Regions:
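Residue-level detector of alpha-helix initiation sites
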Residues: 92, 152, 193-194
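Adenosine-phosphate binding glycine-rich loop
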Residues: 134-176, 284, 289-383
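Rossmann-like adenosine-cofactor binding region
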Residues: 225-306
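An N-terminal-biased, well-structured beta-alpha scaffold segment characteristic
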Residues: 5-10, 14-122, 126
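Glycine/serine-rich phosphate-binding loop and adjoining beta1-alpha1 elements at the start
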Residues: 2, 8-11, 18, 24, ...
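Glycine-rich phosphate/diphosphate-binding loop of Rossmann-like nucleotide-binding domains
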Residues: 22-61, 168-255
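Short glycine-/small-residue-rich Rossmann-like dinucleotide-binding loops
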Residues: 85, 91-92, 111-112, 236, ...
Length: 383
């Protein structure tokens, strides 16, 4: 059960922590969860930082840079998991890492539990505490630890979509921006949040015809103000169907915090789409907003259903590891330092936003959306 409420008098740090940074093992994942500057700050606060050998290479960061910052380079991944009070990662624990999770260990990473019941149950069984980047919500209702990767994924979705519209990739053979005398591609973006907005910016830059659908009229007004050359439409079942018929490239960009993405495109809709059209479902890590979505990898990123190309890579930002690592660590490192310096309970007590990131604690689901998704008992986290 969640810990009981308690008072924390002001004062120095409660105790030092051992913070572990393992190398990411998800397919073609090149990000790392901590920069050398973050390791230095943790060390200066009295914590010990263990970094797996080669963890930063995919982002152009060498072991020597971590060592200069005071981190200890460890060759054995299992040793890091065994010694660390807090594990900082980028992607959710992979099956090979399930046995390494342990009681009372803090796991600070992206989880996206709603799309993965097995992961949810394994973390529950382990007794570890899951602090999820993607559900931390600030006072304005924003998701500050998800935003940078949503920006990257939104921009990448157009890059990848443009590539797979090419004929050698089984696409329609269309240049996204067209050329003089030839019309450009029609890009339909489902969702006008961070992903959708960034996708639209890039698509407009390419010269495509862009339509964004959202069910928030205020958001549509905002998008119309900042991108007057983009068509904004209120999202409903009929409008989505009408737009799918016209689309060359569809971007799935919907999000419900902590929950599975709503299904907006059904299997039957694919038969109305153009042969060789492309769907990039950025919502795949929350289950996807297309009925035919299934997770793919950078190694084997696409598949075809009813002559429509599906690109459903669940870790798109991992392909641009250097950009993504710096963007991610800029926002996650302050929270990692705070948790390490104060302990999770004190940090959550002092920061009323932090409990929103705590999804699992002491074998209990502490996020309502995750509990509802799998029919599990929900208990709010109380620091």
């Amino acid at each position: 059960m969640p810990s009981s409420s308690r008072r924390y008098p002001p004062g120095a740090k409660l105790r030092s922590m051992i913070v572990g940074v393992p190398r990411e093992i998800k397919s073609h994942e090149y990000r790392v969860a901590l920069l050398p500057v973050g390791a230095d700050e943790l060390r200066r606060s009295g914590n010990q930082v263990l970094v797996e050998r080669g963890a930063g290479l995919g982002s152009g960061i060498h072991d020597e840079q971590y060592e200069k910052a005071g981190a200890i380079i460890v060759a054995d991944r299992a040793e890091i998991w065994a010694r660390a009070d807090m594990i900082i990662k980028v992607k959710e624990p992979q099956p090979d890492e399930f046995p390494l999770m342990r009681e009372n260990q803090i796991l600070f990473t992206y989880f996206h539990f709603a799309a993965d019941e097995e992961l949810t149950r394994r973390v529950l069984e382990s007794g570890a505490t899951a602090v999820a980047y993607e559900t931390l919500q600030d006072r304005q209702g924003r998701l500050p630890l998800l935003t940078p990767m949503s920006e990257v994924a939104g921009r990448m979705s157009i890059q990848e979509g443009a590539k797979y519209l090419e004929r050698p990739e089984e696409g329609r053979g269309i240049l996204l921006g067209g050329v003089p005398g030839v019309e450009p591609a029609h890009v339909v973006i489902l969702g006008g949040g961070i992903v959708g907005t960034n996708a639209a910016k890039v698509a407009v830059g390419f010269g495509a015809n862009v339509t964004i659908l959202d069910n928030n009229v205020d958001r549509l007004r905002y998008l119309d103000d900042i991108m007057p050359n983009v068509t904004t439409l209120f999202s409903d079942r009929h409008t989505i169907r009408d737009q799918l018929v016209l689309a060359d490239l569809v971007i799935g960009a919907v999000l419900i915090r902590g929950a599975r993405a709503p299904r907006l495109v059904e299997r039957a809709d694919l038969k109305t789409m153009k042969s060789g059209a492309v769907i990039v479902d950025v919502a795949v890590d929350q289950g996807g907003c297309v009925e035919t979505t299934r997770p793919t990898t950078h190694e084997d990123p696409t598949y075809i259903v009813d002559e429509v190309v599906h690109y459903c890579v669940a870790n798109m930002p991992g392909a641009v590891g250097r950009t993504s690592t710096y963007a991610l660590c800029n926002v996650t490192a302050p929270y990692a330092v705070r948790i390490a310096n104060l302990g999770l309970a004190r940090a959550a007590h002092d920061d009323p936003c932090l409990p929103s990131a705590i999804n699992i604690h002491q074998r209990t689901v502490t996020d309502q959306a995750v509990a509802r998704t799998f029919g599990l008992t929900f208990h709010p986290y109380v620091p």
